[in-house]
Amino acid sequence: MSDVFNANQFLKTVTSSPGVYRMYDAKAVVIYVGKAKDLKKRLSSYFRKNLTNVKTQALVSHIANIDVTVTHSETDALILENDYIKQYMPKYNVLLRDDKSYPYILLSNHKHPRLAYHRGPKRDKGLYFGPYPNGGAVRESLHLLQKIFPIRQCDDLYYKSRSRPCLQYQIGRCSAPCVGKVSLEDYQEQVRLATLFLKGKDHQVMSVLVGKMEQAASDMRYEQAALYRDQITALRRVSEQQEVSNASGDMDVIGAYYASGVACFHLLFIREGKIFGSRSYYPKVPVNTEVSEVLRSFMLQFYLNSDSQRLTPKEILISEPFEEQDELAKAIQAAQNKKVEIKTQVRGERASFLRLALTNATNAVNTRLSHKNTIEQRFLLLEEAIESTNKIQRMECFDISHTMGESTVASCVVFNREGPSKADYRRYNITGITPGDDYAAMKQAITRRFDKISSSGKIPDILFIDGGIGQLRIAQKVVDEKFVALDNAPTLIGVAKGEGRKPGLETLIYGENEESFTLPADSGALHLIQHIRDESHRFAITGHRNKRQKTRNTSTLESIAGVGPKRRKALLQYLGGLQEVKGASVSELVKVPGISLEMAQTIHDALRG
């Protein structure tokens, strides 16, 4: 505990009401946020002489000040605690790092509604289905829906601009309402059935389709009956792929496992008795934290995060009981205005779901620990191979990617002792150089990386350069200039490709003395170098391809006087791509919304050269 903080004096002023407390260190940084039913009793427990919890001892040793906020109830305190944790991200709290909004399927409010992927604020009018565990689950669902229900998925601008059916109609995945290929009544019926399907009422949809097929066959409308038959077949295949539970209703099932500093919460999302999706979460956990606190903190942030727009089911099953379960349920109920039960003692199908979630969480932690141990071992082998006297904490690797000098991009990827640190990855768009000059590109990238070195604080111990002696010399020169007055310059190592570019034959070169050396092909140290080199190459080439595609799609059109981003987008969407725009006649161009006859002629002349 800081010498400036007088715990006894402070505790005399604390009330016994419920509330939230914030603990600060000597730099006035919030290091812990907690809540209590009785603030005085809870805060007094931190300053007992017989503290045995190592984490609490470490926390108390850094306390310089404490702020207290009194609330009306313990439920209010829970909600405020979550808000403060999100705001301050305290060092000693369990932190749920995933804070992205969840994706939904949107059925728009339109004469001919469309099905679309949606993430973010619900500004568009319509029905929202979800949330889904991830974007891939939404896209897979949309793909399946297209096979069963021929409902449009194009945006409204594309819909308005159509004069003939698109490819989706030709392959049977859209009924082309844009050009009147389906009656309004039939289209709305497909929308109704899709809505039922998205609500999990497969059996009801099946009954309707079977009835329609039988009626069409009875009326000798055999072609229509065949369409219904195909819909039924597709629906049955999809339904068979989903695991069905005898446990009715909606529930979240949480399997919690914590070992060797790694925690995983595996969630099964059960909707209408089916496994709607699953997802694993790996919160940041302070050392020596109890499992019960980890689970409580995770659920607090997961279910009270207003930014996620999450719809919580009435039933939550958890594999580990913890104190304040009832209080947390009340807080969720207050936040979402619905009754919620948190259960641990369950039987039958629910118990089976809990076992499944716990198995997945356990396997995920063991896999992470195995990977973590492998990475750690490779770091040790690398330290031994290069005879490093210091522990390597951070490594970076640079690579350059371009096509004949076009759209040059440099990548910087970062590894720490747990593996890739993707939050620290950076790309640099290279400009103002002679196309294809890799040396100039490397110089610009390294210069930009270390331009603000005095305030960065994140200096790599080793800087790998994917290239030969020439690029390494350029990088070493920049580093020498940037670190001339500093003593923490990184060690530079060039990674030159071996004969035939075969892995295992790489030549490694020290930047300082240009001494070269090799490592055995089966060396764990070399595998680590190959890993960061390959990741740098992947990250660079992905950025380059994206930039090149964007340039090719935009520069040709936007270089034409009068064609800005909006007109470019309208042209590409209406006609289907850049090649189609180039091949369009003036009469076809003028049909695009926002393109006058004069503008159409200008575009036509510019593209035909």
UniProtKB/Swiss-Prot annotation:
Gene3D superfamilies: 5' to 3' exonuclease, C-terminal subdomain, GIY-YIG endonuclease, UVR domain, UvrC, RNAse H endonuclease domain. Coiled coil: none annotated. Residues 203-238 form the UVR domain. Pfam families: GIY-YIG, HHH_5, UVR, UvrC_RNaseH, UvrC_RNaseH_dom. The keyword GTP-binding does not apply. The keyword ATP-binding does not apply. GO terms for molecular function: DNA binding; excinuclease ABC activity. GO terms for cellular component: cytoplasm; excinuclease repair complex. Keywords: Cytoplasm, DNA damage, DNA excision, DNA repair, Excision nuclease, SOS response. SMART domains: GIYc, HhH1. Belongs to the UvrC family. Interacts with UvrB in an incision complex. The UvrABC repair system catalyzes the recognition and processing of DNA lesions. UvrC both incises the 5' and 3' sides of the lesion. The N-terminal half is responsible for the 3' incision and the C-terminal half is responsible for the 5' incision. This is UvrABC system protein C. It comes from Shewanella halifaxensis (strain HAW-EB4).
